[in-house]
Amino acid sequence: VSKLIILAIFSFSFQVYSRAPGTYAQMRYDIDKVSQKNLISIINDLVKVSAPSRMIGLPGHDKARDFILDSIKAYDKKGAGKIIVDSFSPDVNEAERFYQADFNEKIEGKFSPTHPDYQKWFKFTTYMKQTAQRLKSFQGTNIIWEKSGLNAEKTLVITAHYDTISLDPNTLMIDEKKPMPGANYNASGVAVCLSLINLLSKIDLNYTVQVVFLDWQGVAFLGSHHYAQELKKSGKNVLGFLNLEMLGQDTSFFDKTKKTGNMSVYYRPQDEKFVQALVHHGSQITNKIAFQMKPMGFENSDNIRLWEQGFLGGTFSQNWEEDFNPKFYQTPQDTPETLNHQTLYSAYQYLGGAVLGTLLDITK
């Protein structure tokens, strides 16, 4: 069940809010109008207002949704785009299928039923299926900011989930009583998306853009499952998508290569041409960060649901192979103080370049 509520439609083709940059240098000037201080304040405010957790069914979850809506209206004061609040009933049958299929593919037949790994993942699978059933009365809410371009038929999509989940690393069970600030997971992605709205709302674009704040990521990616299905039904000509997940974790201490600024973009071989263009645009804006191209797929974020519906794209994230710190992942330690603020801001600049370069066909 989907209920679309259009809160504001103020886009008119004859309105001009600012010049459209025609070069990378001009683009950088516009991108830098959002400061590092602005970006970090979004994370601090979101974590504070939604404390102790943004998990489905808890008060902080609804507060996070309202925070995002209020922030969009504040950044797009002139209504250059429209806000679509897409409320949906979670497809718990799909959640059960998702977890069972994952277990069947990776565990069943590969381990004896008495093996500890089999037992661990069997319990997890059963538990998550039960969790989906337990939470099914809580509607999900995807928030979409859409701004039309000169060629409105072509659409670029940027996504980031805003809910959190806290899992015990040993039992893999959800601990709802534990605080889960979710600064990196995924207030970082939300903050970059809101900053992109701040940027894009003031520039005339060649193509339409959707910036999407996804719900229900923590349970079978049901928010992106719903969004991707609706996007497919719409018949839009989608250029591709950028999924933003955990952009603030970057250390030299834990990094196997002892470097910072080495982030990753995960995609499939068929996404390479689209992702390569994004990387080219982004790298023209800043050299303080690099998103290494990794055509290995990615199973830990909402990109999988968009891939299921045939869309091209990838997930921009931290370096999961060389600088993944489990101490902060889905734990109470995931606080704003643990983030690398310089890397996060550089990620915003880079992604701003990737997005604007695509939407404006920048070549020089």
Report residues per predicted region:
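Second-shell loop/turn segments in exported
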Residues: 25-33, 49-60, 129-134, 175-186, ...
